[in-house]
Amino acid sequence: MASLQDIIKERIKKIEGLRKLGINPYPEKTDKDHNIKNILDGFDVLVANNTKVCVAGRIMSIRGHGAILFAHIQDETGKIQFLLKQDQIGQEKMDLFEHYFDLGDFIEIKGIVFQTNTGEKTILVDDFKILCKALRPIPTEWFGLEDEEEKIRKRYLDLILDKQTKKIFDLRIDLTKWIREFLYNLDFKEVETPILQTVYGGALAEPFKTHLNALDMDLYLRIAPELYLKRLLIGGYEKIFEMAKCFRNEGIDKDHNPEFINLELYWAFASRDELMDMLEKLIIFLNNKLQEQSIWGNIQVPFPKIVFRDFIKTKTGLDCDSDSLDKFQEYLQKNNIEFEQQSSRAKLADLIFKQFRGEIKNPTFVIDQPLELSPLAKQKPDDLQHVLRFYLIMNGKEVCNGFSELNDAMEQKRRFEEQSKMLQKGDKEAHPLDLDFVEALEYGMPPAGGLGIGIDRLISVLLGVNSIKEVLFFPFVRQNPKNI
């Protein structure tokens, strides 16, 4: 069996051979006028009219020799067989194909379509040309590859060879399009805000730090677009959203990637309940669009609502309002759950919630979180230790976080100052003091509801895949030692 290097050397010789024949192995233009799906869908009409087609794609298989060759060509839309016959294209063209074309090469073919005796839809070729001569062969075996990280590193091969992978990413593209469609129909406007920020904020997370040489200034990659979007509410926009690439310098697992897409949405004059109602409609809309591709079937509405502290008490017996910090620490130690000693009672309660979150399978709202976990949310009028906030949990995962936005500038400054003290004590996820945002808030911001949806996580939940890595084209993986 030839080694990879031998195969590459042989293909380089073929490139040189093509050039000696006056053939460019990497031409710019093609006469392509159909994609493969067009041909398969309109096959009967094309046959009846004896229509000549021109398609371009990658050679996926070749069989036969001599006077007849069968092969398959694949483009973004599908795969179809093509037939080369010596009496159709001549000996010179047959020799050219046999001697210079390999699996993985891109080719343009022209001809008419017909159906073989076995019923396979086929293009009878009367002309062809090389579009790209590949140096490396496409692997013949891809399914069952044990090294998942290698599969991700070479996602391009995964897309070429695994129909299910391609299908998942096609659905991802559709889902983001449908989300925008849903929001546009409600008169939301899509906006863009800075990724490089002098003060990070909008979430409790550790940021990535970078440096702007031109101004000798340290900057952060945004962890969320929230504070800039709220500035737009202050500026007069009432219904806005952003599909924001965000970055968090935290753990990597099946639910987290250091960079991710977060849909953040703000709706002036809307309450938390109105926001939850809209979110329900969005989930139902996406589920209906997916039809049989969704794992959820008919989702029942309205989604159940569970109060955060009631959920904790039901699962552990702990009372988030009255039990001491020591009691929470004892529970975590007894159950071998790691925690940081400086963590507050509210943070420990949130840690406990995450331990039991996996038990919530059907779409469910968890509401009324502790104030300390929510420095940007409005307090409940009748319970100032809790806020008008919600999580949407689906299949044990948090896919959305939303709340009624705090618009009291003095209260916001006080909370930022409290968070800043926590940051100085070593809490890397505490919110920094952002006086520029406080100044903006002092000009007045309308009451508003806001939410953030982890798009990667939502898509993985709707499609029933186990990890967000399966819905990210290029999730973060360790660098291959061979390439270091």
What is each residue range found by the language model?
Residues R58, I234, L392-E405, M445-L463:
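Conserved phosphate/anionic-ligand binding catalytic regions in large, soluble enzymes, centered on
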Residues A409-I484:
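Active-site pocket scaffolds in enzymes
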Residues G201, A205-P207, F285-V399, E418-M445, ...:
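Metal-assisted phosphate- and nucleotidyl-transfer catalytic regions
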Residues D95, F101-D102, Q115, L265-Q291, ...:
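Well-ordered alpha/beta subsegment
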Residues A2-I7, C54, S271, C320:
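Extended, domain-scale alpha-helical bundle/helix-rich regions
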Residues I15-L21, P25-E274, N336, S460:
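Class II aminoacyl-tRNA synthetase-like tRNA-binding/catalytic domains
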Residues M1-K20:
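Nucleic-acid-binding small beta-barrel platforms of the OB/S1 family
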Residues T198-G202, L229, R248-G251, E372-L376, ...:
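Flexible loop/turn segments at secondary-structure boundaries
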